[in-house]
Amino acid sequence: PAQPAMADKADKADKPKAPRLTHPEPVHSTPDRSETLRRVDGREMRLAVGNSHFPVEQTEAWERFEEAMGRPLWGRYLYEDEGKPVAAIALYRYEMGGQTFLWAKHGPVWLKEQSPEREAHLRRLLRSVVKERDRSVRFIRMHARYRAADLRELLSTITYDRTYVIDLVPKTPEKMAAVMPKDGRRAVKRAERVAREAGCTISDETGLSREEFDKVYEVLRETAERDGFKPHDAEVYWTMLTSLGEKNARLFVLRKDGVPHAWDLILTSGKDSVAYYGASSNESRTFRGAEALDWWAACTLAQEGYRGLDLMGAGSTRVPSLYTVGQYKKRYAQHVTEVDGAWDVPVSRVIYSGMSAAKRLRDALRARRGSRED
């Protein structure tokens, strides 16, 4: 639905105003290639990307969230060929075990041909920039399509290089279901019916109070205990909602008798949406709460004009641990979508090797303690 003119003005007023670079860095290049790397501000990066797919983590809006979490913007850069943008990247300063690294989530954003040679050259230029600007940075975490000798598996967290995206272009639930696999069509219709008969309600609760959000968060504790992972503190999710704002972050909640049983935190950028976080209670399985909620979210976003809902991650030969969740997600799309996975790019190979060795030792000790407890 169309928004009031005042809302449009408010959106524009809320956009972060990145400061202009008063002392711009020199343009970085190598003698063997024509592409160059240049530091830019948020406005110039946004103009360069234009109408191309722009992951929310690379937008100016994301800077608000990272700043609120104590992870400042390290820099935005344009990779260009004869003055024409080829790729854009925003990097944030992170700390892990007392060591500093840079994280470009879902970056770089490629605007022209993404060849193995260009990927490698961009990384070479970035390493050079880091060595000049900040000797405390140990590695860069960024995405790449092609395996290469300078890439390492992640020291922490997991990535994904395959995902499923619900096609929202058909807009109506009937047409959206028609382009899904047969078992997916049956599943969403059944989930919709079972949840309705159980008396469930689903709504957009993006503007809820902190007190109410804390109650919704408790569903994630139950999910984590069931599925064996450690969730972030509630403050992380709340900060994401409030710092990104309704234009880029939404919270959809399924309730039964007023009690929250499932929720999706969905991020948006342009015409694209991503199911960033989600949770469901054990009881919700009896009335297919998570399935009903995911389908409702997809239908709602389709009506608002979004073109896809990325379910974020599916199993692959590189990340087999995502196989099970991928089996659930595959019902929503006819085909898997290949995406660039994240990699670590050592700036100092010696120090990074030491960090890797220390992690292997910690993992081995943890496994040994676990086996003794068993």
Give, region by region, the residue ranges found by the protein language model.
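Aromatic (often tryptophan-rich) hydrophobic motifs at membrane interfaces
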Residues: 103, 123-128, 238-353
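Glycine-/proline-rich flexible loop or hinge segments
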Residues: 99-114
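Active-site/acyl-donor-binding loops of N-acyltransferases
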Residues: 7-34, 38, 145, 150-175, ...
